[in-house]
């Protein structure tokens, strides 16, 4: 008994699960079909003129697309997050779209709720003619998509790829919206009007679409009229209608073709600009490299010259010093005049003069020079003596020379006066 009850319960659960999945599949198919009808209506009526918020076809299309993006959407994660909408998914999944409008919509002051931001994004994407690009980019982020949608959602099925293909044709239409209207308040629910599509018949210019002739909710009802095939018409009025519809279809395709050609030209111009900029940057980089190499070589040459100068100065440092020191020694001890030709040499002792002891004072500089000469003669002079030394050598008994006697350290001095160029005064 209990076993049969459990089996029946499991069977009922399986049937309810199948019924639930079937209802989700029907809902998914109906939304995609209605979206296809809505896009076709927009392309047929508004190819030559822009669309604004007052268009009923656009209001219905916006409601359909909002239902598609909200199909099987998960609720808020916690109680303080508030009611989430598809904008939370778009904000994360479309952040990688180049030059996107996500940050602009986030910074709008008059739009606060998540639903209002989603509606504003839908209008901005249509005005940018990039709605299909946004949705295609969001679908590539499968991890984020599974995070925001439950199993069976349109965004997780192959119908999402069909949706992006349908939305490409909207690039041929010019949209103009005001982002401060009542439609962006986010308080009212988006309601789809199915009445224009309940008895939608297949037109002559969409013969290849098999699903377009089916109705949405009442496809199996008695009121719906099916038109699987178009009968062959021969009257003139029917041919005119067919020609008129084909002409309208041609205008739509031509407008789409013009839009795609313009898009291709834009991308080609952008590519050329990028290539030119790349060439300029490459040339500038090469020029900078050449300039840096030139400056490097110049700096290396300067370093080599400085090194040569240093190596030439360091070994010959003592030669200019000896030259500079020899000049003041010669000037300080010039040659004495020949004031006595009879005597060749005289030896002066401290006690040989009746006057106070004469001496020859040596300055500290001369003593230092004597030390630097390493034992060489500290006074060199030739035979031709100058009068500047007469006061030092000829007036030994004068008073100024006597006053400088205490500074004399040596006891005797030898003055050689001869014809040979020998030192004039050497200490004995």
Swiss-Prot record:
Keyword Coiled coil listed: yes
Domain RUN: start-end pairs: 52-182
Keyword entries, A-Z: Coiled coil
UniProt xrefs under Gene3D superfamilies: 1.20.58.900
Any Pfam family matching the protein: RUN
Coiled-coil positions: 237-314
Name this polypeptide is given: RUN domain-containing protein 3A
